[in-house]
């Protein structure tokens, strides 16, 4: 939150080939500056039928996210296993990107804005170089998430670190999460233990008052420093990766990605790849349902739908970037003899239909390493993979990369001298719709044993609509006065208060029930 009014202008680009059509749209919103970055390329190279899509949510600055968007896909294409074992290549690229940032500051040359070079060097302290310089250690409190999708032939790989997310829609609008937020409060117990054993401590529940309600966050901090992060895996953030007594994979923050790979079948409709700015406001099932319903309308344009989804992130107070990838009907019915160089690609994307909340299901498509699949209470199936592989970014000219109005050429081929288009974001995690964080010491339920935050569904008040007039949250976002508020739902309710004498009592009761939580911040 750094602006008196949100920056609602959007960067939007679309492209298609005979198999897929995609639209990418990004918006700064209430963020003080743009820290999201993205990369989208329909044809990554001439030799293989490979497409690449990546969203990078920066924090502590935009530089790391921009670097990922410019360089990730190039590192991938240059890897020796790119053609024969794409899974292994992706895994190594995640780690090599982290190493590149830590070895020297040469990477910053790719992300220096050409029209603001003097200010950058002043900020970096170049003018003070007569004094001996300390050994370079990498960006201490600058980092980025990464959520990427690589499509080759009739197969796809999803790899990620952090809390940017990829969601698949199967026929009928069934939402399936293909990535899982890397946060100590929502991942496995081992994730939290790793952070604690490396010297991290939890601030517990940090509250920020917003219009009479409260936002509750959990943040990890170093035991001896004031800096903190809200994710447990990232690229960069080397202040959290410098414990000399621990191996790389045991540091407080790591860069080991989770990977999921599977065949693309004809019942798959589209993918949504987005930064935390979107998922802070709406859950996976709501996003997929909205897009599915809009696509069913005759004459609906994918570009317009993507921009509408980006606007949902306005209430988060963060930057929002969304890549919407639509599979064309019948385009993925063929089967390759060789799995297109995916190597030991392993996966299992859950296939559920009308399954009861909390039930688990698995499909017979593919095989997945150390994975499990469950359906969450919001109705979206989740498939959780073990730790395997990484990913890249898109290409374009350096000028286009640092210019928010630049264009990503979807059919650009990878050139070692080229780079990708980008924008930038601060991914602070927040609860999803319908959830309230009560304490960081209470278990969620049977499926979340070991989590030290409790999430419960509000029983009386539906968090997706106004508790006074009953208007839905999506319609409230269309009201200019409400959409510009930090909390659109509460702002709308305050308007209703002037029209309903009983509203004040209802708001008071709601506040008491929600206690110290407002998931719409």
Swiss-Prot record:
GO BP annotations, alphabetical order: signal transduction
EC class of the enzyme, as a word: hydrolase
UniProt remark on cofactor binding: Binds 2 magnesium or manganese ions per subunit.
Top-rank taxon, per record: Eukaryota
SUPFAM superfamilies cross-referenced by the UniProt entry: PP2C-like
Stated family: Belongs to the PP2C family.
Record-annotated PPM-type phosphatase domain positions: 21-327
Swiss-Prot/TrEMBL cofactor(s): Mg(2+); Mn(2+)
E.C. number: 3.1.3.16
Catalytic activity: O-phospho-L-seryl-[protein] + H2O = L-seryl-[protein] + phosphate; O-phospho-L-threonyl-[protein] + H2O = L-threonyl-[protein] + phosphate
Pfam families, alphabetized: PP2C (PF00481)
Protein's name according to its UniProt entry: Probable protein phosphatase 2C 16
Region span, Disordered: 354-431
Binding sites annotated in the UniProt record for Mn(2+) 1: 57-58
Gene Ontology molecular function, alphabetical: metal ion binding; protein serine/threonine phosphatase activity
PROSITE patterns xref list: PPM_1, PPM_2
Keywords linked to the UniProt accession: Hydrolase, Magnesium, Manganese, Metal-binding, Protein phosphatase
Keyword hit for RNA-binding: no
Residues annotated as binding Mn(2+) 2: 57, 276, 318
UniProt organism field: Oryza sativa subsp. japonica (Rice)
InterPro entries for the chain: PP2C, PP2C_BS, PPM-type-like_dom_sf, PPM-type_phosphatase-like_dom
């Amino acid at each position: 939150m750094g602006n008196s009014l949100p920056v609602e202008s959007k960067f939007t680009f679309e492209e298609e080939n005979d198999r897929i059509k995609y639209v990418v749209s990004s918006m700064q919103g209430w963020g003080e500056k743009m820290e999201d970055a993205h990369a989208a390329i329909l044809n990554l190279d001439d030799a293989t039928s490979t497409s690449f899509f990546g969203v990078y949510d920066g924090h502590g600055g935009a530089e790391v996210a921009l670097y990922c968007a410019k360089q990730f896909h190039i590192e991938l294409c240059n890897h020796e296993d790119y053609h024969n074992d794409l899974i292994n290549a992706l895994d190594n690229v995640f780690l090599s990107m982290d190493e590149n940032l830590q070895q020297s500051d040469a990477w910053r040359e790719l992300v220096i804005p050409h029209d603001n070079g003097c200010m950058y060097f002043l900020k970096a302290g170049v003018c003070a170089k007569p004094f001996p310089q300390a050994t370079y250690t990498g960006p201490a409190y600058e980092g980025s998430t990464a959520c990427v999708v690589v499509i080759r032939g009739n197969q796809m790989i999803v790899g990620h670190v952090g809390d940017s997310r990829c969601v698949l829609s199967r026929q009928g609008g069934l939402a399936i999460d293909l990535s899982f937020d890397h946060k100590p409060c929502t991942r496995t117990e081992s994730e939290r233990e790793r952070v604690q054993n490396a010297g991290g401590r939890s601030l517990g529940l940090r509250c920020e008052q917003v219009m009479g309600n409260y936002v509750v966050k959990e943040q990890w901090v170093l035991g001896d420093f004031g800096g903190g992060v809200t994710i447990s895996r990232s690229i960069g953030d080397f202040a959290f990766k410098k414990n000399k007594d621990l191996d790389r994979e045991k540091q407080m923050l790591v860069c080991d990605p989770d990977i999921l790979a599977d065949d693309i079948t004809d019942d798959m409709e589209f993918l949504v790849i987005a930064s935390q700015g979107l998922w802070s406001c709406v859950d996976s099932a709501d996003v997929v349902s909205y897009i599915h319903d809009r696509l069913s309308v005759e004459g609906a344009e994918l570009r317009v739908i993507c921009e509408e989804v980006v606007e949902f992130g306005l209430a988060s107070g963060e930057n929002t970037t969304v890549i919407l990838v639509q599979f064309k009907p019948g385009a993925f019915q063929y089967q390759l003899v060789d799995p297109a160089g995916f190597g030991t690609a392993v996966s299992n994307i859950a296939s559920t239909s009308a399954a009861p909340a909390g039930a688990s299901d698995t499909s017979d498509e593919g095989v997945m390493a150390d994975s499990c699949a469950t359906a969450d209470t919001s109705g979206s199936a989740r498939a959780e993979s073990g730790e395997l592989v990484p990913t890249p970014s898109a290409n374009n000219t350096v000028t286009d990369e640092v210019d928010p109005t630049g264009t990503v050429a979807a059919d650009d081929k990878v050139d070692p001298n080229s780079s990708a288009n980008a924008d930038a974001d601060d991914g602070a995690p927040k609860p999803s719709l319908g959830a309230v964080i009560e304490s960081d010491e209470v278990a969620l339920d049977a499926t979340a044993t070991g989590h030290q935050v409790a999430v419960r569904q509000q029983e009386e008040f539906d968090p997706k609509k106004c508790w006074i007039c009953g208007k839905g949250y999506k319609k409230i976002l269309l009201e200019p006065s409400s959409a510009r508020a930090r909390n659109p739902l509460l702002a709308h309710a305050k308007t209703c208060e002037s029209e309903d004498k009983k509203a004040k009592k209802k708001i008071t009761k709601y506040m008491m029930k929600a206690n110290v939580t407002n998931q719409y911040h």
